[in-house]
Amino acid sequence: SGVILDQYWNYVKKKKIKFNLAVSNTHLLNNFGYSKSDIIKDGFKIDDEIFMTLDGYNDVTMAKSLAIFGQSFSDLLNRVRPDWVVLAGDRGETFMASVISAYMNIPIAHIQAGELSGNIDGQARHAIGKFAHLHFASNIDAAKRLEKLGEQKFRIQNLGAPQLDDMQNTQKILIAQKKLEKKFVEISKINYALCIFHPVVEEYQRTKKNYSILHNFLKKHVKFRIWISPNSDSGSNIIKDSFNKLRDSNDLLIDNLPRFEYISLLKNCDFIIGNSSSGIIESASFKKPCINIGRRQKNRFSVRNVVNIEVINYR
């Protein structure tokens, strides 16, 4: 399960707060790793499952999938009637959950509010912020932005990025690394790039070209590449199909990993490349270089280990 879920669970147990856990989207899909099983293994009880993702993975199916989520989520809230809805990040289903919650007059707490990014997720994050009642920012830049956007100061708390707390848990990382090496490859004995390239909704027509340029560049310059599957946004099927056509014996694709197994991958890599927020937020904890490509994380708050490339242009 994700770090945010772990920390939230520890808090509500301590405070003896009852909560309802709903999982959706790729957590329930076999072709995206079926991470629901990881949530259960970590000891969480899943109260509701919201199936939403239509096949096709284009702009139309993505929009319809969000509409399906909205219908199901409103039924869930009507049945449970919680005192609060806790949302994290900037995903489309998170945005839909904020809209439904607000219109059903249920207060919203938003984790990692106020950050910038360059694609539709960034727009969703700020839209969620306008529906939310409590804003948990991950840095002072985001906290100040929330205030400039008109949110009341007493509602804003700068709590830091929750992902970073796990970076110092060396024992769990080492145990997870041993599990990962049994399943895939002995990462401690090879040099590799950690590659994560998600589709960009606004650049759907260029997905194949952009991904192919990146993959071919890495094949030429990096001996071993470990890839994490893209998310389910429109264009994800194009990336997966392109990977299968371009891959060779030095490419490894992993659909889903438990949290600490992923951290062990990040800790041992030579560098991380692509357009994932993990490179922006987490890689500096291990002093790993991050090559951030394109608009998806554009203007995201980052430190000196991140190199931003505006446009993929390789001959």
What annotation goes with each model-predicted range?
Residues 47-51, 137, 157-159, 252-256, ...:
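Short acidic-hydrophobic, aromatic-tinged amphipathic segments that line or gate anion-handling sites
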Residues 39, 175-268:
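Donor-nucleotide binding loops and adjacent catalytic segments primarily
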Residues 15-62, 72:
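Conserved nucleotide-sugar phosphate-binding/catalytic loop shared by glycosyltransferases and other
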Residues 1-14, 52-153, 158:
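Active-site and donor-binding regions of nucleotide-sugar-utilizing enzymes
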Residues 28-31, 131-209:
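A nucleotide-sugar donor-handling region in carbohydrate enzymes
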Residues 18-25, 135-136, 224-231:
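Short internal beta-strands
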Residues 87-88, 95, 99, 110-111, ...:
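A donor-sugar binding/catalytic signature common to diverse glycosyltransferases
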